[in-house]
C-alpha cells in the first residue's frame, strides 16, 4: 500500500478497494463486439458519476470483473444497485433486442460477488486482466474430447 492508495474526504482518509463480479441474468453470453465495448463505456461513465475509480476491469462474454475504489460514503450494496439498475436501462436503450431476451426488464442476476482487496491489489488486477484468457481456455478444455461417439470416461 503506497501513499497514492490513500484518498481523502473531509476529515476522512480512506483506501477502500473491492473486487466485484456480476453477470447477466441466466448467465447468458451477450457481451461480444459492440456490446462488450458499449457496456464498458456505460460502466465507466456510471462509475465516474459516483466518484468510483476503476483500477482494472474485464468484460467476459457472460460476466464482468471490476477492481474498484469506492468512497466510504457509498456502501457497496447501494453502489451495485445503482450500477446494475442504471446500466440495464442504458443497455436496453442502446440495444432494443435485449428487451425480448429479458422480458422482466431485469438484465442482471440478482446477486453479485464482492471481496475486499488488501495489500494484494496488483495480484487481483493481474487476475482480472487474464480472466478473459482463462475463460477461453476453460471453454476449450470442456469442449475437447467430447463427441457423439466418445464415452464420458
Placement of each model-derived feature along the sequence:
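Basic nucleic-acid-binding interfaces
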Residues: 1-153
Amino acid at each position: 500500500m503506497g501513499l497514492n492508495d490513500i484518498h481523502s474526504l473531509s476529515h476522512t482518509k480512506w483506501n477502500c478497494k473491492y473486487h466485484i463480479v456480476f453477470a447477466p441474468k441466466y448467465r447468458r453470453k451477450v457481451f461480444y463486439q459492440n456490446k462488450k465495448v458499449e457496456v464498458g463505456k456505460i460502466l465507466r461513465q456510471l462509475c465516474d458519476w459516483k466518484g468510483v475509480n476503476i483500477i482494472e476491469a474485464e468484460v467476459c462474454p457472460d460476466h464482468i470483473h471490476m477492481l474498484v475504489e469506492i468512497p466510504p460514503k457509498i456502501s457497496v450494496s447501494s453502489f451495485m444497485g445503482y450500477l446494475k439498475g442504471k446500466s440495464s436501462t442504458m443497455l436496453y436503450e442502446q440495444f432494443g433486442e435485449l428487451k425480448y431476451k429479458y422480458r422482466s426488464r431485469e438484465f442482471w442476476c440478482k446477486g453479485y460477488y464482492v471481496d475486499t482487496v488488501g495489500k494484494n491489489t496488483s495480484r487481483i488486477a493481474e487476475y482480472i486482466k487474464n480472466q478473459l484468457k482463462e475463460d477461453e481456455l476453460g471453454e476449450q478444455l470442456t469442449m475437447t474430447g467430447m463427441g457423439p461417439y466418445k464415452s464420458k470416461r
